Amino acid sequence: IHYENPKVIGGVLPFYHDKILLCQRSIEPGYGLWTIPSGFMECNETLQEGAKREAQEEVGIQCDNLQLFVVYSIPRISQVYMLFCSELASNNIVVGPETLAADFFSFNTIPWPDIAFSAVKFSLNKFISNYPITNNEFFIN
C-alpha cells in the first residue's frame, strides 16, 4: 500500500505591540509577495519546533511563547496550514535567504493586494478582528 498524505505547514504570526511582522518572499510560489514566516515541517520535529525554525530562518526571530491560532485546510493541494501567534519581546529582525525584506505593519498599512496566500489573508483577518489576542482564540477555515 502506498499512502499519499497531506503536507503540514507550520508558521508564526509574530507581532510586536500592535504591529504584525510580514516577510517578502524571495522564492516561488509568490516571489515578491508578502507572507508570514512559515514552511513545511521537517521529519523528526514537532509542529512548534518547525514553526520556530521557520521564523528563525526567514526573519531571525526567537518565538518563545507560541499560541495555536489558525488551522487552514487546503484540500486542492493537499496541505494543512497550522499557525501560531507569538508576541515578540523586541522588534529586531534579520532577513534570511528565503526573504527579500521584512517589516512590521500596523493593521491599516498591511499590503493586502500583495499578500501571498489565502491562508495568510484568512489568518491576518482573524488576528486583526480579534486583537488583542487572548489564550482562547482559535480559528478553522
Predicted regions and their residues:
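A generic structural signal for short beta-strands and their flanking turns/coil linkers
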Residues: 8-10, 30-32, 64, 80-82
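Short acidic-hydrophobic surface loop/beta-edge motif
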Residues: 12-14, 72
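Conserved beta-strand and immediately adjacent loop positions that scaffold enzyme active sites
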Residues: 11, 19, 101
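Unchanged
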Residues: 41-126, 133-141
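Surface loops and adjacent helix of pleckstrin homology
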Residues: 7, 25, 115
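Short glycine/proline-enriched turns and hinge-like loops at secondary-structure junctions
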Residues: 6, 33-35, 78, 96
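Conserved Nudix-box catalytic region and its N-terminal flanking loop in Nudix hydrolases
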Residues: 15-57
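Acidic, metal-coordinating catalytic segment for phosphate/diphosphate chemistry
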Residues: 1-12
